[in-house]
Amino acid sequence: MTQHFDLIAIGGGSGGLAVAEKAAAFGKRVALIESKALGGTCVNVGCVPKKVMWYASHLAEAVRDAPGFGVQASGGTLDWPRLVAGRDRYIGAINSFWDGYVERLGITRVDGHARFVDAHTIEVEGQRLSADHIVIATGGRPIVPRLPGAELGITSDGFFALQQQPKRVAIIGAGYIGIELAGLLRSFGSEVTVVALEDRLLFQFDPLLSATLAENMHAQGIETHLEFAVAALERDAQGTTLVAQDGTRLEGFDSVIWAVGRAPNTRDLGLEAAGIEVQSNGMVPTDAYQNTNVPGVYALGDITGRDQLTPVAIAAGRRLAERLFDGQSERKLDYDNIPTVVFAHPPLSKVGLSEPEARERLGDVLTVYETSFTPMRYALNEHGPKTAMKLVCAGPEQRVVGVHVIGDGADEMLQGFAVAVKMGATKADFDNTVAIHPGSAEELVTLKEPVRRPGDPLPEGAA
């Protein structure tokens, strides 16, 4: 016998939980299908365990910096197994919360792997479920290239399973995941090498952030190799070797981490049985309202090819439920001006357009402001990472279309500035805001002279 629901969410990660929770709050009958622990990548092998370890790495840095401020810190060595055990207990508590919360909401939890039978019917381990509305929110998985010896490396999932600290690490990829793991491992004392196919780190970010990040990583002791095309991994008694297409060899690593992107978890869902369009890369295209090409079937989160960020999946899921069940027929997520943070050492953040993006989209109408400095946090230390900031402003009114920050506190300070950008704030609005002193964020409201005006060329390497 087939059980019928108002909504079925396939995937118990951020997006699936959000749409299921909201639909249940509207009194709808909801089923949630998941084969693993609730919380998805973010809770189990992503944002949450990463952030716990990021905090630990900053404590290690603080211990090293303490003597410069007259604080005699003792110890400072890392107990990796203890950190991992505490981290995993914390994740387990979050899993338990979600298990109980889903039950309290009256959501039917279905354990197993879902496959479409038709556009409104799902089969899970021999059990059939149907719904008026089905949401696909199955997230993604780390990519491992098909190269000789690729199995000698681990992914970010494997990193969070490590029971001992790796001592000499190669990270392949310089996106969010690669940069974040590089920073925290180096702060723990590991030797770290990052290789990337692109010609700069975090190539999708503003060039100022990429350049400052490279400078800070170099000062931290992280070795980088750009335009390095990995052809194979090899292993001998000395460890694992990275072999580039041009024959360059980097040798002697005890761990190699693949951080070259993520692929959508859409294989084996039987999407073809429902007639759901799937792109060659596995992404499920949707319109602005999360509709797929099949009425009553929706997709959200990483599988749609949009911003692969937890808050984006949550926001899209909640808005979808409001549209379907709360009479808000035009409710949808605005994907413009979504803020994001990379938890590097120090972190970097952005909202809006980079300078090259703004130039391409808006034309030669930009006024750009920049600053860089070493913050007071390192006033009594011999060295400290650089902070850098950029405002990208457009038109004669100088509407702020991009805010870019790297430095201590960048992760927390950007949220408020993101509200301002979303509301259409101008440079004059920033100027008319009284600064908080002393602090790094005040620089964003006290920038005076532009470094570039309309008609000025982009700086070299900023295209």
UniProtKB/Swiss-Prot annotation:
- Give the cofactor note text: Binds 1 FAD per subunit.
Q: Which reaction(s) are listed as its catalytic activity?
A: 2 glutathione amide + NAD(+) = glutathione amide disulfide + NADH + H(+)
Q: Which UniProt keywords apply?
A: Disulfide bond, FAD, Flavoprotein, Metal-binding, NAD, Nickel, Nucleotide-binding, Oxidoreductase, Redox-active center
Q: Where is the active site?
A: 437
One GO cellular component term of this record is: cytosol
List the GO molecular function terms: flavin adenine dinucleotide binding; glutathione-disulfide reductase (NADPH) activity; metal ion binding; NADP binding
Which superkingdom heads the taxonomic lineage of this protein's source?
A: Bacteria
Q: What is its EC number?
A: 1.8.1.16
Q: Which Pfam families match?
A: Pyr_redox_2, Pyr_redox_dim
Keyword check for ATP-binding, yes or no. no
PANTHER family given in the database record: GLUTATHIONE REDUCTASE (PTHR42737:SF2)
Please state which protein family the record places this protein in: Belongs to the class-I pyridine nucleotide-disulfide oxidoreductase family.
Report what the protein is called.
Answer: Glutathione amide reductase
**Organism the protein comes from:** Marichromatium gracile (Chromatium gracile)
